[in-house]
Swiss-Prot record:
Pfam families, sorted: SPOUT_MTase
First-tier enzyme category under EC: transferase
Name of the molecule in the record: Ribosomal RNA large subunit methyltransferase H
Alphabetized SUPFAM superfamilies for the sequence: alpha/beta knot (SSF75217)
GO cellular component: cytoplasm
Alphabetized PANTHER family for the sequence: METHYLTRANSFERASE, RIBOSOMAL RNA LARGE SUBUNIT METHYLTRANSFERASE H
Gene that specifies this protein: rlmH
CDD domains, A to Z: RlmH-like
NCBIfam families the record matches: PRK00103.2-4
Source superkingdom: Bacteria
Length: 157
């Protein structure tokens, strides 16, 4: 199984880029993991919120492949503790044959078409985070889940 984090828009602040890349590299010791970046839309000032979600949704759908298991990181998704997320990842590793794709949408969330193709939604918190920060938090949680599953010393309960 390959695990992909699909995100809309690039990370611009160097300290986030460095930390995200560090956790991606650490995670690759355990699983095949990468982050794909969908370029952000240009000239969005002329678009309504719904129009921007639709255009970003089209780009997200284009990046998906047949057989992908699609999990949206969404404020209305299921919340999990780190141990629960590790168990979730273990179940996915045992059942997903192709790609497990976690998706972080644009600033206004997902289009209805993206919601329709999604298999699941999970929430990182009831709080709101910047799109840059949630990428870092999520890749850290993927790494944490892998260390839990492999008996590493990283996580303390």
């Amino acid at each position: 199984m390959k695990t992909t984090l699909l995100v809309v828009g690039r990370t611009v602040e160097q300290h986030y880029i460095t930390a995200i890349n560090d956790y991606i590299q650490r995670t690759k010791r355990f699983i095949t993991f990468d982050m794909e970046v969908i370029p952000e839309l240009k000239n969005t000032k002329s678009l309504s919120m719904d129009q921007q979600k639709e255009k970003e949704g089209e780009l997200i759908l284009k990046a998906l492949q047949p057989g992908d298991v699609i999990v949206l990181l969404d404020e209305h998704g299921k919340e999990m503790r780190s141990l629960e997320f590790a168990d979730y990842m273990k179940r996915k590793m045992n059942t997903v044959n192709k790609r497990l794709v976690f998706v972080i949408g644009g600033p206004y969330g997902f289009s209805e078409k993206v919601y329709q193709v999604a298999n699941e939604k999970i929430s990182m918190s009831k709080m709101t985070f910047s799109h840059q920060m949630i990428r870092l938090i999520f890749v850290e949680q993927i790494y944490r889940a892998m260390t839990i599953l492999n008996g590493g010393p990283y996580h303390h309960e």
